[in-house]
């Protein structure tokens, strides 16, 4: 039975070494970014968000070393890119108990916040309560956690949801794995969602509700899907990229010569987006 207090993908976390430099990189790709946020001291992190509907992309950097950001620092020692993926939690405390009954020792719930300057100048707070599956449980090399938004109106701000590149929502998260079926089965157990075998040996795992799916495939299979895109910087195991539903006419204009046509998609190679392949497809 699927988890009751955890629904589909909420956001993806792109770990970056230089937060402000990364923000400029993603602005050049045609994204609208939130003002820079600083999380509660025990988190030791700062971020920019790229708000879509109903999900988003978070650029996250470590500002101060803390116990809670040790896994993120270990990831950054190797590379940049998507380090973890959040599910939407209806109730983080109840969700943590749900996974406990399934044999996973949750980390948290953890409460934190960050100040938000609203478009009208008011200074408010975005408040969250999260819990994580155990760090060792990382299907496809990616950690997963769940995020309960206590103040959605300070996160999904309409002015931040309009992007020059036409981006609208996440459609798929691409996870490279030498053994896609094994990694997909791991995630399926963790979230109680059945995988769907594809003809080429890749596996789709729905995240829940109408949210983006996970697609597990080998790096070789990924290369066959996007043959004209340089993928050498991507790992053999880990999150390779994001498929984003968009207005492709706007995408083409925003990316210009930096966009690579591949079939019906327009791609930004990992080298241009902090180690994350971006695949824009028609919304």
Pin down the residues of each PLM region.
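Conserved beta-strand edge residues that scaffold enzyme active sites
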Residues: 40, 113-114
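Glyoxalase I/VOC metalloenzyme domain signal
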Residues: 2-9, 14-33, 52-111, 118-283
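Conserved catalytic-core motifs of GNAT/GCN5-like acyltransferases
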Residues: 33-41
């Amino acid at each position: 039975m699927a988890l009751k207090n955890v629904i589909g993908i909420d956001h993806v976390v792109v770990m970056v070494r230089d937060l402000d430099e990364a923000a400029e990189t993603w602005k050049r790709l045609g994204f609208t970014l939130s003002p820079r946020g600083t999380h509660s001291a025990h988190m030791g992190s700062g971020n920019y968000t790229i708000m879509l509907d109903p999900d988003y992309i978070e650029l996250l950097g470590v500002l101060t070393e803390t116990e809670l950001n040790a896994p993120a620092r270990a990831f950054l020692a190797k590379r940049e890119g998507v380090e973890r993926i959040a599910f939407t939690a209806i109730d983080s405390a109840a969700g943590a108990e749900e996974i406990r009954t399934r044999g996973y020792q949750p980390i948290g719930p953890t409460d934190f916040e960050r100040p938000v300057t609203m478009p009208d100048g008011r200074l408010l707070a975005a408040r969250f309560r999260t819990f994580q599956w155990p760090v060792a449980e990382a299907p496809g090399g990616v950690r997963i956690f769940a995020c309960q938004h206590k103040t959605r109106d300070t996160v999904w701000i309409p002015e931040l949801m309009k992007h020059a590149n036409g981006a609208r929502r996440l459609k798929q998260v691409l996870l490279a794995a030498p053994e896609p079926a094994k990694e997909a089965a791991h995630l399926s157990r963790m979230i109680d969602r059945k995988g769907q075998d594809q003809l080429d040996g890749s596996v789709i795992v729905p995240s829940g509700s109408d949210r983006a799916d996970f697609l597990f495939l080998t790096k070789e299979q990924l290369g066959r899907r996007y043959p004209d895109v340089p993928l050498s910087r991507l790992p053999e195991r880990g999150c390779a990229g994001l498929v984003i539903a968009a207005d492709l006419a706007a995408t083409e204009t925003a990316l210009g010569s930096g966009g690579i046509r591949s079939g019906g998609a327009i791609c930004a190679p990992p080298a241009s987006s902090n180690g994350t392949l971006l695949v824009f497809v028609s919304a």
